[in-house]
A protein has these predicted regions:
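Conserved beta-strand-loop-alpha-helix junction that forms the acyl-donor binding cleft
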Residues: 127-137
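Conserved N-terminal entry element of GNAT/NAT acetyltransferase domains
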Residues: 1-27, 165-175
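Conserved catalytic-core motifs of GNAT/GCN5-like acyltransferases
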Residues: 128, 144-162
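Conserved acetyl-CoA-binding loop-helix of GNAT-fold acetyltransferases
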Residues: 96, 102-116, 138-142
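Acetyl-CoA-dependent GNAT
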Residues: 12-16, 23-92, 97-99, 111
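Short loop/turn motifs at secondary-structure junctions
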Residues: 90, 121-123, 144
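Conserved GNAT acetyl-CoA-binding A-motif
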Residues: 118-129
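Short acidic/glycine-enriched loop/turn segments that link adjacent beta-strands
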Residues: 87, 133, 153-156
Length: 175
């Protein structure tokens, strides 16, 4: 566990604990996305779809979820899902409760935690962001990522940058 001054902690979710925390993680995602990119499905339909996808993804040793809590898992306030593959670090999903967004330096502290835990051979950073999510696109731009294409269904942009640019951002500025 790593803390910052606001008692925010980061911990890796053990793959066998996904069932225990899945609804809490999804609730944060759903509450954030309902206004940005609603699916038109019920909350339960979206949960089942998300859960099935995440369970499948978490079978890989290269995929991880970092849980963000406000101290000893008293309250989960967010999560970060990522994967690594040879020289690429893919930021798959970051969700922070609205009431904590932009506070306590969570975002930058999270990246400090991540940078300590990913392999040195990483050279590139990638992410996908919904085309309508201008906030995410702006943040990814500050991290040194640029649009290089779209996902298969055209809903999201595919972005890429260098690991070096991410480290430079972490050492210099806040988002």
């Amino acid at each position: 566990m790593e803390k910052n001054s606001a008692m925010v902690e980061f911990s890796y979710l053990e793959k066998n604990e996904l069932d225990k925390y899945a609804r809490m993680l999804f609730s944060i995602l759903f509450d954030n996305m309902v206004n940005i990119a609603p699916t038109g499905n019920s909350r339960e339909e979206d949960y089942k779809s998300w859960y099935k996808a995440v369970c499948g993804e978490m079978q890989s040793d290269k995929r991880h979820i970092i849980v963000i809590s406000n101290g000893n898992m008293k309250e989960i306030i967010g999560f970060f899902k990522y994967s690594t593959n040879e020289s690429v670090f893919t930021m798959e999903e970051i969700q922070i409760k609205r009431s904590y967004q932009g506070k306590y330096n969570i975002f930058k502290t999270l990246y400090g935690f991540v940078l300590e835990h990913i392999a040195e051979e990483i050279r590139f950073v990638e992410a996908y962001a919904d085309k309508k999510n201008t906030k995410s696109l702006g943040i990814l731009g500050k991290l040194g990522l640029s649009i290089i294409g779209e996902n298969k269904n055209g809903i999201s942009y595919h972005l890429r940058g260098t690991y070096e640019a991410l480290v430079k951002w972490y050492k210099k500025e806040s988002v």
